[in-house]
Amino acid sequence: MIPVRGFEGKTVAVFGLGRTGLTAARALIAGGAKVALWDEKPESRQAAVAEGLNVVDLTTSDWSDYAALMLSPGVPLTHPKPHWTVGKAKAAGVEVLGDIELFARTVNAAPEHKKPKIIAITGTNGKSTTTALIGHLCRQAGRDTRVGGNIGEGVLGLEDMHGGAVYVLELSSYQLDLTSSLKPDAVVLLNISPDHLDRHGGMDGYIAAKRRIFLNQGKGDTAIIGVDDPWCQQICTEITAANRRTIWPISAGKAMGRGVYALQGVLYDATGERVTEMADLLRARSLPGRHNWQNAAAAYAAAKAIGIPAHQAVDGLMSFPGLAHRMETVGKLGKVRFVNDSKATNADAARQAMSSYPKFYWIAGGVPKAGGIDDLVDLFPRVAGAYLIGQAAEDFGKTLEGKAPARQCGDIETAVAAAYADAVASGEEAVVLLSPACASFDQFADFEQRGEAFRAAVNGLGKPAAKRA
């Protein structure tokens, strides 16, 4: 745990008692603060009381008693409308912050010899894979590495800092909205496409949240920016003009005079005086597809930015084992391979997986995002069959009509069985791809549970029907 500094003897209100909120409360107490915890779910309050934490009804308490409000990232700060705790905090002149901000202030207050290296990663898609990949590269190079934030452990639950440590942090737009003091040694902005627009008041607000990750960088720091979409390209241009830090653009599709890029699966380093071919990513263990080439370019650049030798970074790329639910092969029956890409919760993420196969049997659906799958129409000729589930099934069927064969399946078990039957009937090598292009909350707790349901359905195909039931 990282004890939070700066609130010794003061009381911090904490709203939202999930993983982030409880971890922050413990870290605040460890640093000498007092806490007042609240959650609208009675079971969450009861769990906090059982742990011996101080639960206070923030709807009726005196907010002038609080030095700050620690808001969990899932709670709206501004849109669709500010949460009631935000209103009470602002009315009382109480600052609102998140766990990443608490971490940042603690780092900033530490003596120079105790300050760790920080690599911060954001973007619409690929954050978790890139974060895990950078963590793997750092560990393989012998660095004392802690990976967390929006992936795995909450940042304040990670092991306490020292001067030789490296913190590799995935940051969501929600977390960045609540952060103002973080100063990463290396920042990775992978890509931007429309997502979470209801929480940011539109595309401009979403881009502004992502851009906050660069707020405090200066001389000696490195900004690593994907330039394969227009929004990130614009940010790269503007930040380069500011001329305050090292800028390394990254791309998975175009050669550049400076930065790191991949062409046809070959990774090139153009951060020095000449362009050097570094690795054949087609031979990497778990980095299939163009989107993963961008992730690899980002990870290589981030490792180099904190002083890891190029050959060690390349070794890490080649040995990376991959992450569950991100283009994860979960089984093969005969000629049919099953790929779990449950993390694809929007169309742009699904595009990355769909672009990796010339033909596939596609399981899609759930809670749709704005625009549905309209932007994927250019990939429909690759769809040998679509098997639709969840709330989006009917609308997706209409979008696919006349463009690709589609079937209403309702649930994931039915979809897997139908896709497998059609794939076998083709007599060819085939891929059944779960890449839903939707959130999961209509049928599952989260994308992980959806991915595990897919895995279970695939495993069930190899068993007699009576046992599957």
From Swiss-Prot:
GO molecular function terms noted in the UniProt entry: ATP binding; UDP-N-acetylmuramoylalanine-D-glutamate ligase activity
Pfam families (UniProt xref): Mur_ligase_C, Mur_ligase_M, MurD-like_N
Binding site for ATP: 123-129
Keywords for this protein: ATP-binding, Cell cycle, Cell division, Cell shape, Cell wall biogenesis/degradation, Cytoplasm, Ligase, Nucleotide-binding, Peptidoglycan synthesis
Family: Belongs to the MurCDEF family.
Compartments (UniProt record): Cytoplasm
Highest taxon of the lineage: Bacteria
Function: Cell wall formation. Catalyzes the addition of glutamate to the nucleotide precursor UDP-N-acetylmuramoyl-L-alanine (UMA).
GO BP: cell division; cell wall organization; peptidoglycan biosynthetic process; regulation of cell shape
Protein name as catalogued: UDP-N-acetylmuramoylalanine--D-glutamate ligase
Catalytic function, reaction form: UDP-N-acetyl-alpha-D-muramoyl-L-alanine + D-glutamate + ATP = UDP-N-acetyl-alpha-D-muramoyl-L-alanyl-D-glutamate + ADP + phosphate + H(+)
Pathway recorded for this protein: Cell wall biogenesis; peptidoglycan biosynthesis
Predominant location category: cytoplasm
